[in-house]
Amino acid sequence: MAAGMMKDLEAFRKAQRADGPATILAIGTATPPNAVDQSSYPDYYFKITNSEHMTELKEKFRRMCDKSAIKKRYMYLTEEILKENPKVCEYMAPSLDARQDMVVVEVPRLGKEAAAKAIKEWGQPKSKITHVIFCTTSGVDMPGADYQLTKLLGLRPSVKRVMMYQQGCFAGGTVLRVAKDLAENNRGARVLVVCSEITAVTFRGPSDTHLDSMVGQALFGDGAAALIVGADPVPEVEKPCFELMWTAQTILPDSDGAIDGHLREVGLTFHLLKDVPGLISKNIEKSLVEAFQQFGISDWNQLFWIAHPGGPAILDQVEAKLNLDPKKLSATRQVLSDYGNMSSACVHFILDEMRKSSKEKGCSTTGEGLDVGVLFGFGPGLTVETVVLKSVPLLD
């Protein structure tokens, strides 16, 4: 009897799991309507924060913006909103309540906009969504943004939710890792993944004693990305664009304090050490070897690349360290140029850009004609997320 029960349990456990790997079935993105031109941003930023008397600092900030490789960003914070909330414009003024009032509404709202696009592309009824993963570094609330999104979209009350607050820029990889595990261990699961980021928590006036804060003011933008992740796609109905083959997370050695953020009365403060690009480029090959030796790949130019664009210096140093063909990071640099650093949402914007540009260029796969690729998330810790992706053939 015990043997029979064990056999039944094994069959039950096997029946719970999917047969194939997790796949990305749809991608949707959204930004606030307010677009900010990077070339004129220093003038606007110093004017709106009443800092025009700080002429040397303004020139330093202008150089930061010029070197950012960003042409445009999108921001929820308009001139009108900032004039109504002068404490948000000051450097280190108590302003958390005002910031929270903005983001607890706007983060799920922007997430809903991206999610609606992903659900439409997916083409299945939203009642088939079994899990929700919501990620944001913008504010904290209870019930969380996952709950608000569920209500806004009209998802089933029994949908299984995971909420990730305060993860930072590596979390675009984290959500894929968690979604993969959910999809592959729950047969028929369809996971709605949403990353929504609003810079209202980090915006503040300039300071000549906190230049790393100004780096953030020059780089960060607002955006939300949504994915549908599931295994065993329904033939002729669901159309995968990438497969999630393997994932890892690691803390880089000797990187304590390299990137950190603290939620205080003044909002979310960010601290960056100058050597962040060096730390990442020095350690990235180890992550690549760990990920790809099982696939027999050691030429990093054989891969398609999605790297979180923390800033141009990180991309430049990674490119140099690995002797990458400059075209490898073209999708990554395009998103940085068009949107800035949107924290966790960035890598999903890059996935979307890659599959679309691959189709436009007539490539044979969603991964620029290549079969296997890598997605990297870099963030506080210094934490690195690695995701091995398989592209999907593009049919004529």
UniProtKB/Swiss-Prot annotation:
Catalysed reaction, written as an equation: (E)-4-coumaroyl-CoA + 3 malonyl-CoA + 3 H(+) = 2',4,4',6'-tetrahydroxychalcone + 3 CO2 + 4 CoA
UniProt-recorded Gene Ontology molecular function terms: naringenin-chalcone synthase activity
Pfam entry (one): Chal_sti_synt_N
InterPro entries to which the protein is assigned, alphabetical: Chalcone/stilbene_synt_C, Chalcone/stilbene_synt_N, Chalcone/stilbene_synthase_AS, Polyketide_synthase_type-III, Thiolase-like
Positions annotated as active site in the UniProt record: C169
GO-annotated biological processes: flavonoid biosynthetic process; polyketide biosynthetic process
Pathway: Secondary metabolite biosynthesis; flavonoid biosynthesis
Keywords: Acyltransferase, Flavonoid biosynthesis, Transferase
E.C. no: 2.3.1.74
Family statement: Belongs to the thiolase-like superfamily. Chalcone/stilbene synthases family.
Cited function: The primary product of this enzyme is 4,2',4',6'-tetrahydroxychalcone (also termed naringenin-chalcone or chalcone) which can under specific conditions spontaneously isomerize into naringenin.
Alphabetized PANTHER family for the sequence: CHALCONE SYNTHASE, HYDROXYMETHYLGLUTARYL-COA SYNTHASE
Identification of the protein by name: Chalcone synthase
Species whose genome carries this gene: Pinus sylvestris (Scotch pine)
